[in-house]
Amino acid sequence: MGIRAIVVDTAGTTTDLNFIEEILFPYSAKALPAFLEENQHNVLVENCICDVQDIALEPDASLARVTEILLQWIKEDRKATPLKTIQGLIWKQGYANGEFKGHIFPDFIEALDGYKQQGLRVYSFSSGSVEAQKLLFSHSDAGDLNDKFNGHFDTRTGNKRFKQAYCNIVNTISLSPKQILFVSDVLEELKAASEAGLNVVQMVRDDSQRTGDFKTISSFAELSI
């Protein structure tokens, strides 16, 4: 029973972590106050504001307080769904205005075509929202890559460090765990995926990166399936 699908992490695996931490996160933090002020009555944004109030256990939090909470979550790199949804909406404006392009490692761009030729399905799994993932891959230096993916998963699928998230992916794409390969740079994610029965490979793009007992690669060019 061979590999039929690849699930890739984004930050640190397909995308330079510096792009996320030094461009996307600061951009969302800077734009957040004005974005919330202007869009607070948009249904999706309004729902996110309510979710923030619920998670923070502050049901009566003002818009200013919600903004303060979200800015703190950005600093902490919290994987909270309402934050990720709002960040995705803010980044959509940034991409549309041409303020940045989505960084994708060239070795992954090249590998995508090979996976399609092999008949493999390709999915991404990120703590960033599905919308943010689609924006990242559609605004890459190599153009729109979204048609090379079969789907995307985010925090609504589960916490990437918990086994259940990968069980949910298995159920969604209707393959057996051993037919799926998960590639990530984060050991805790690989451990959770392995516990769910998936094949795993660690992407090590930085020599200072923490490694464990999993097979490692430094480029998708090294990945043989």
From Swiss-Prot:
EC number: 3.1.3.77
Keyword terms: Amino-acid biosynthesis, Hydrolase, Magnesium, Metal-binding, Methionine biosynthesis
GO biological process, one term: L-methionine salvage from methylthioadenosine
Cofactor: Mg(2+)
Pfam families: Hydrolase
GO MF term list: 2,3-diketo-5-methylthiopentyl-1-phosphate enolase activity; 2-hydroxy-3-keto-5-methylthiopentenyl-1-phosphate phosphatase activity; acireductone synthase activity; magnesium ion binding
Cofactor stoichiometry and binding remark: Binds 1 Mg(2+) ion per subunit.
The protein's annotated pathway: Amino-acid biosynthesis; L-methionine biosynthesis via salvage pathway; L-methionine from S-methyl-5-thio-alpha-D-ribose 1-phosphate: step 3/6; Amino-acid biosynthesis; L-methionine biosynthesis via salvage pathway; L-methionine from S-methyl-5-thio-alpha-D-ribose 1-phosphate: step 4/6
Keyword Ubl conjugation: no
Catalytic activity: 5-methylsulfanyl-2,3-dioxopentyl phosphate + H2O = 1,2-dihydroxy-5-(methylsulfanyl)pent-1-en-3-one + phosphate
Enzyme class, first EC level, given as a word: hydrolase
HAMAP family, per the entry: Salvage_MtnC
Function: Bifunctional enzyme that catalyzes the enolization of 2,3-diketo-5-methylthiopentyl-1-phosphate (DK-MTP-1-P) into the intermediate 2-hydroxy-3-keto-5-methylthiopentenyl-1-phosphate (HK-MTPenyl-1-P), which is then dephosphorylated to form the acireductone 1,2-dihydroxy-3-keto-5-methylthiopentene (DHK-MTPene).
Subunit and interaction comment: Monomer.
NCBIfam families: enolase-ppase (TIGR01691), HAD-SF-IA-v1 (TIGR01549)
Family: Belongs to the HAD-like hydrolase superfamily. MasA/MtnC family.
Protein known as: Enolase-phosphatase E1
Organism: Shewanella halifaxensis (strain HAW-EB4)
